[in-house]
Regions:
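Conserved P-loop NTPase "ATPase switch" module shared by AAA+ and STAND
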Residues: 13-38, 54-63, 227-256, 479
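Conserved Walker B catalytic segment
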Residues: 39-47, 67-78, 218-281, 285-295, ...
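Conserved catalytic segments around the Walker B and adjacent sensor/switch elements
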Residues: 54-57, 174-190
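Walker A/P-loop-proximal flanking segment of P-loop NTPase domains
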Residues: 104-156, 167, 171
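Winged-helix-like regulatory helical subdomains adjacent to P-loop NTPase cores
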Residues: 129-136, 170, 329, 342, ...
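P-loop NTPase Walker A phosphate-binding motif
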Residues: 153-183
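Conserved NTP-binding/hydrolysis module of P-loop NTPases
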Residues: 181-212
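Conserved small helical "lid"/interfacial subdomain of P-loop NTPases
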Residues: 302-332, 350
Length: 507
């Protein structure tokens, strides 16, 4: 643990004894006497009436076989949701012998956690994301934080947009430079309701006075501008971030994007706004924006892509490595990344399921040899073939294809057309925009035919950004078979396309 710019940063990826402890703390239990694994478990069952992460100092020495037996009991216990970290004489002497100020916390976690049960992964994007698990995205984070950086952030579900915004807030808000940062979730809110919620959040954060609460963006931006001119209680930089902003942006089009123009007017070295969403509506409606002579096309966009192999590998292996889990070879890692489509949220889901498998017959591991826990092809298939896991993967990939449903549902239509083309003539080269239009004409999909080639091309680019499609120089294929399999066989694809004949909504 170390402080930088007034904030605490943790050197290990374990939230239980890192960021979670900032609010929840943790319990320290000191035990003397002769304690074998069974006696220890009896004691932990008794104190577990108050569920809390716990460090146990045991004034005794455990043999390796006892330690491994204790590890199995902890991991298989169904009632423990928190971490019990055991430090006995052997481990304590080891840490003392190899003491290093910069490495001691990492060393403790890496030596004790393989013998504990710990679940650090949070695949649900709506939940609080532990900063210790934040992986890669350094350039994207800087563009969000910088006064001269991006204003419009977009990308699909499970790609970590909310985690990026919250990481920016954590690094900026209340730092030693007198900066503030606020994240406001405006999911499903139109511009008046969004203004109300933003003003309330700024009041709650002590940035604006209670009298500043309003539902008018013109009034709200004047309040913000005056607040930044206050020299008695200065804010040297305010970063305002709106998450889940698709409906907000869409509603702004009815009044020529006036709220976004108002925010743009007060943007300076002391203030920046960021709007995150799943779909770049301003770029998609470029003609409308240009025709209204609005300077929004000059706002810098930032696309959040799925991970590349190095980032995906780090997220998959780093925290698990502290828990004593190793992968048999690079092929095993590649299979997992492909199955999860390189989506950070799905990679975390796999890690979560891998750890949960320990609670069922120790995931088939031999107690006398573990830890370490080597993930073999057998363990890989056990998780990947689990019906519950695959259903969750299907649901989350389905969400990705329907992420623009409120703006027309074009992703799903295009995906179905490319699947139809695949079943007609399998081709690694892919399918062109002209071929996509041809199928749309055949099936009378008016919703897609009303779009210009430029707009369809924009959608294809976005689907490539989401790693749904791959671009082969102007022709498009599914990036992985996961999405094609999600859509079904040729008959199922044809039946789904039939739902879009004419102007009808999906059945």
């Amino acid at each position: 643990m170390k402080k930088r710019s007034g904030h605490i940063y943790y050197s290990h990826p374990i939230p239980a004894f890192g960021s979670d402890s900032e609010e929840d703390g943790f319990r320290v239990l000191c035990i003397t006497g002769d304690f074998n694994p069974e006696r220890l478990m009896d004691m932990l069952e008794k104190i577990n009436t108050v569920s809390m992460n716990t460090i146990i100092f045991l004034d005794d020495s455990m043999s390796l076989s006892q330690r491994r037996h204790f590890a199995r009991k902890l991991k298989e216990n169904q009632s423990f949701s928190k971490v019990f970290l055991l430090i006995d004489r052997v481990l304590l002497f080891y840490l003392a012998k190899h003491y290093s100020t910069n490495a001691i916390n990492r060393m403790l976690m890496a030596t004790a956690l393989p013998f504990a049960y710990c679940q650090p992964f949070i695949p649900e994007s709506g939940k609080k994301f532990p900063p210790e698990l934040f992986t890669g995205r350094t350039a994207e984070l800087e563009k969000i934080k910088s006064p001269n950086g991006a204003n419009l952030i977009y990308g699909g579900r499970q790609l970590g947009k909310s985690a990026l915004l919250n990481m920016a807030r954590k690094e900026i808000d209340g730092n030693s430079q007198g900066h503030r940062a606020v994240v406001v979730d405006v999911f499903q809110l139109k511009y008046p309701q969004a203004a109300r919620k933003v003003s309330q959040s700024l009041v709650d954060e002590g940035i604006l006075d209670e009298s500043c609460e309003c539902d008018d963006w013109s009034v709200l931006t004047r309040h913000i501008k005056r607040r930044l001119m206050d020299e008695e209680n200065p804010i040297n930089y305010l970063l305002l971030m709106l998450d889940e902003g698709d409906i907000f942006i869409q509603s702004c089009s009815a009044i020529k994007y006036q709220p976004i123009s108002e925010l743009k007017e007060i943007q300076s070295s002391k203030f920046k706004f960021v709007i995150a969403g799943t779909h770049n509506l301003i770029r998609f409606n470029r003609e409308e924006v240009l025709s209204n002579n609005i300077g929004l096309t000059h706002l810098e966009p930032l696309t959040i892509h799925p991970f590349k192999t190095p980032e995906g590998t780090e997220l998959l292996t780093h925290a698990l490595g502290y828990l004593g889990i190793r992968f048999q070879d690079e092929n095993t890692i590649s299979m997992i990344l492909a199955q999860t489509n390189y989506f950070p949220g799905l990679i975390q889901l796999y890690c979560q399921k891998l750890l949960e498998a320990m609670k069922r017959d120790y995931a088939g591991y031999n107690e006398t040899e573990t830890p370490p826990y080597i993930v073999t092809e057998t363990h890989l298939k056990s998780v990947l073939s689990d019906p519950g896991f695959n259903e969750m993967i299907r649901q989350k990939l389905d969400i990705t294809l329907k992420v623009d449903k409120d703006e027309g549902g074009y992703y799903m239509i295009i995906a179905l057309i490319i699947a139809e083309l695949y079943y007609r003539k399998q081709s690694d080269a892919g399918y062109s925009l002209a071929e996509i239009r041809e199928v749309a004409v055949e099936n009378q999909i008016g919703r897609l035919l009303r779009l210009t080639d430029e707009q369809i091309n924009e959608l294809l680019i976005e689907m490539c950004d989401l790693n749904v499609l791959g671009d082969n120089g102007g022709t498009y294929v599914f990036s992985t078979k996961s999405f094609r399999e999600l859509l079904g066989d040729q008959k199922e694809v044809a039946n789904q396309l039939a739902n879009y004949i004419g102007d009808g909504e999906e059945a």
